[in-house]
Amino acid sequence: MNIHLVKTRYSNTYVIEEHGKLLVADVAMRCDGFVLDFIVRELKHKVSSVALVVCTHDDPDHIGGGTPLARACHAIAAIPHASKRPTLKFYRNPIGPMVKIATTFGEAFRSRSRNMYMNKERNRRYEHIHNHHLDEPAAQRFVLPKLRLIDKARLDGFPNWEVVHTPGHSWDSICLFHHPTASLITGDTLLGSGSKGRLVHPAIYDNPVAMRRSVEKLRRLKPRTVYPGHGSIFSGDDILNHL
């Protein structure tokens, strides 16, 4: 099993090679062409090698490019159980919208946010890449099989990967845990700070109590390597103990 990091315009995408197939996690809006180009040019795989495309939550920088990429590859698309279900998310976490607005407002004034979302050079570098497979008639006609991911489920075709429901950043947030290697893909539940040299909590969240519980849940898994939705990858023993 090999996990490849693809740094896209807005977030980290992960392309996982396992048992001769590809699993793709978190494709941002307008970055599907960039990810598909990486699969074809860098990994030398056919688009048909992609069997499953998943997202960790329904923010546009994690779900936005998943559907067009899955269509181009004739793959299955899988999203968390509560994604794209605002009524369910509000019922489960009624304080969520107000907390998310408050934390987003605070983060919006930080220079790193402006650099991420308002950087024209980053736009030119990533968004101009378009793969012809995205426009093929067969991709447009393809009826996309969709799955909903619930806590403790195993990914279709990739049974070594377990879904872990981790509300906090958003109620629909999930992580993906690979049991044989203790590898953990966290989306926005945990981020990797290169400057601090460790994993950190996200600055934007919708429920701090749920966040603490989710981190404790992940700590019990004892991950050896953590692949965050933004920032650097970290490996080692007890890498969540400081959180």
Segments from the language model and where they lie:
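A conserved mid-domain beta-alpha-beta active-site/ligand-binding segment of alpha/beta enzyme cores
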Residues: 148, 156
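Conserved beta-strand hairpin/beta-sheet module of binuclear metal-dependent hydrolase folds
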Residues: 1-43, 175-187, 192
